[in-house]
Amino acid sequence: MDVNPTLLFLKIPAQNAISTTFPYTGDPPYSHGTGTGYTMDTVNRTHQYSEKGKWTTNTETGAPQLNPIDGPLPEDNEPSGYAQTDCVLEAMAFLEESHPGIFENSCLETMEVVQQTRVDRLTQGRQTYDWTLNRNQPAATALANTIEVFRSNGLTANESGRLIDFLKDVMESMDKEEIEITTHFQRKRRVRDNMTKKMVTQRTIGKKKQRVNKRSYLIRALTLNTMTKDAERGKLKRRAIATPGMQIRGFVYFVETLARSICEKLEQSGLPVGGNEKKAKLANVVRKMMTNSQDTELSFTITGDNTKWNENQNPRMFLAMITYITKNQPEWFRNILSIAPIMFSNKMARLGKGYMFESKRMKLRTQIPAEMLASIDLKYFNESTRKKIEKIRPLLIDGTASLSPGMMMGMFNMLSTVLGVSILNLGQKKYTKTTYWWDGLQSSDDFALIVNAPNHEGIQAGVDRFYRTCKLVGINMSKKKSYINRTGTFEFTSFFYRYGFVANFSMELPSFGVSGINESADMSIGVTVIKNNMINNDLGPATAQMALQLFIKDYRYTYRCHRGDTQIQTRRSFELKKLWEQTRSKAGLLVSDGGPNLYNIRNLHIPEVCLKWELMDEDYQGRLCNPLNPFVSHKEIESVNNAVVMPAHGPAKSMEYDAVATTHSWIPKRNRSILNTSQRGILEDEQMYQKCCNLFEKFFPSSSYRRPVGISSMVEAMVSRARIDARIDFESGRIKKEEFSEIMKICSTIEELRRQKQ
């Protein structure tokens, strides 16, 4: 970018420039290779923090498990996971006392959700551990596979389409002595190619039925697959994140629904709201503390950091919290909510792909799968890896590690926030019974603590008491990484507060630029990002105008669509020049067709096609927006699309932008290299499921009808619908008798084929 950075700082106060010190420009770091090492680190660290707990063995799976609950109270500042049950329950009781009826009301709201949620709720989300294939899959495919397996094993409650009925099947599946699954495998054979007469490897994909006994099934059902967290800025080391399987997901969803409902009612919770709403909520708490700290009181704020939040949380503690929160509720509701924490207390972490070995001398590479780590000779590994493996060995079963304590990242964000807020709640004067008092904000593992007291000693005493109270519930405030300031300056979830929130503009930098979806979407997303930042992030008019010019420049270079009258030569310039010369109204050409840019900061809210429509030549309009044009992939034309925008920090955000379908809204085809691998069978299944879904939507155009999950139930629904429609059409004379009987014949054939398949 040809911008002199010093110009940006001429007229802004220093605290506004803090955001430019962030590692947010440029590409974020990605991980390569396997996540096995990072996962072992997580498992070993988690056990180390709880090492003084009690060891037991799971009777079903034989996995060794460590239980640190009610363990020894810490004597030093090292992080530890020894939460005390009675302290957690007491914190919950005080939270309820300060917010009468909060748990009761949230339970009622959740009960309603539990009874209404459909099983297709689980198709949301990206990669999911698919226990039938023992690898990650898109959520919809993983769910379809699970349901297919359940049905072929006689578990059919899920056919009602309600999530709660699917969860009944999950519970029953765990009691079965064995389960039959279909797996994909790959055969390789050497054959001679007729054309070249060379030997080539031919791959064929097969499916085979396999029986899994109760123990192996339970291990799979309790497994969290692990991957490396990508694109994390400001860190030297990568870390592992977990993706749970379909058995756990539904239960977690209900627990988080309950916790979300509680968080919405707590003024100290930074979840589930975001953006400007969150800023307003936080500003309220700060205002309260500053108005209450009369002239006699001091007020200080800690920008807090917790050490290894997830690894010191404990599912058994969450079970205690849920038991308390649901204390007067119906038995079925209490049971369904307690299953998630119980499953997490028995969870297994899958170690990923294993290690890759390379011999430079012999040019050989070989992969040691995670399953072999239990038995392989350790002389091949370097010292640090050897230590890791030695430590983890007692915990290994079938390539997964037993991991009872700890929570893994991002599983119970809402519920852990409730725990954090319950400690902030204890800072009221009626509980501290002394001259100091505290309040604050909590959002998952991030917190800000505001302490008020008559003098510095009081502030110190307040902070110490908060620190010790946290230790009792397994929260470890880091003394090294937290810092304290006079109230009025602090940071919370990357929002910087200085007598009001300062716009942290650099957070948004990565989302500027060309997304690379297609010409139409990229233009729309680019201007929407600039518009949104003018609204939310103090992006001033001059800077916005500059951002817009840079974006257009970037866009033209990306798609090689410089103006038709430019001197720049690219692969497209010949065609674009020709178009420019034939066009009467040149202002009507889209930027991607070599036209001029008509955007300025006043009209960013208008899609480019609409902005230029009146200026376009008629034949250009006809080519651009013609549903019969074979290059336009018209999905249904929605007025609003969602783009995934990467802010520099936190999860990818979904951002709405206006979508006008034109010849520029193409969808790229999938990379073909996958077709030669063992993933191919899985890909074919996925495509089949996709085709089936598309067909289904043609049969049931009404959006009020929710589609069932799994191919078999969809086929049943379509066949019966076809019969009904055919009968109505026949009786009203819209189709002839021959056509009617042909439709009936096809329906019977489909059913017959399905019976044979089963």
Swiss-Prot record:
Ranges of Polar residues composition bias in the record: 55-64
HAMAP family, alphabetized: INFV_RDRP
Pfam name, any one: Flu_PB1
Region (Disordered): 50-76
Catalytic activity from the UniProt record: RNA(n) + a ribonucleoside 5'-triphosphate = RNA(n+1) + diphosphate
GO molecular function term, any single one: RNA-directed RNA polymerase activity
Name listed for the protein in its UniProt record: RNA-directed RNA polymerase catalytic subunit
Motif (Nuclear localization signal): 187-195, 203-216
Assigned keywords, A-Z: Eukaryotic host gene expression shutoff by virus, Eukaryotic host transcription shutoff by virus, Host cytoplasm, Host gene expression shutoff by virus, Host nucleus, Host-virus interaction, Inhibition of host RNA polymerase II by virus, Nucleotide-binding, Nucleotidyltransferase, Phosphoprotein, RNA-directed RNA polymerase, Transferase, Viral RNA replication, Viral transcription
Matching Gene3D superfamilies: 6.10.140.720
Region Promoter-binding site, residue ranges: 249-256
A single BP term in Gene Ontology: symbiont-mediated suppression of host gene expression
InterPro entries: RNA-dir_pol_NSvirus, RNA_pol_PB1_influenza
Subcellular location: Host nucleus; Host cytoplasm
Source organism of this protein record: Influenza A virus (strain A/Memphis/18/1978 H3N2)
Post-translational note: Phosphorylated by host PRKCA.
